[in-house]
């Protein structure tokens, strides 16, 4: 998911996405441990999506403090 797409979402939607990404990362790590993971690059992608989502949430938090 691109950062621009994340900026278009509401704060509640972002928080839900963050939970979904973390859940997916948990499942991917479990698959990796049991050697059932077909695409290990997906772990990296999900981690980056988590970081992007947290960044957008933090930016909104800082904007709210300024206002």
UniProtKB/Swiss-Prot annotation:
Stored Pfam families: Ribosomal_L29 (PF00831)
Record gene name: rpmC
Transmembrane region(s): none
MF terms (GO), sorted A to Z: structural constituent of ribosome
Protein name: Large ribosomal subunit protein uL29
Alphabetized NCBIfam families for the sequence: L29
Domain of life, source organism: Bacteria
Organism: Heliobacterium modesticaldum (strain ATCC 51547 / Ice1)
InterPro entries to which the protein is assigned, alphabetical: Ribosomal_protein_uL29, Ribosomal_uL29, Ribosomal_uL29_sf
């Amino acid at each position: 998911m691109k950062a621009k797409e994340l900026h278009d979402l509401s704060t509640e939607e972002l928080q839900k996405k963050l939970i979904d990404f973390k859940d997916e990362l948990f499942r991917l790590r479990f698959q990796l441990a049991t050697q059932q993971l077909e695409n290990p690059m997906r772990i990296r992608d999900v981690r980056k999506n988590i970081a992007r989502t947290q960044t957008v949430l933090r930016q909104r938090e800082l904007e709210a403090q300024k206002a």
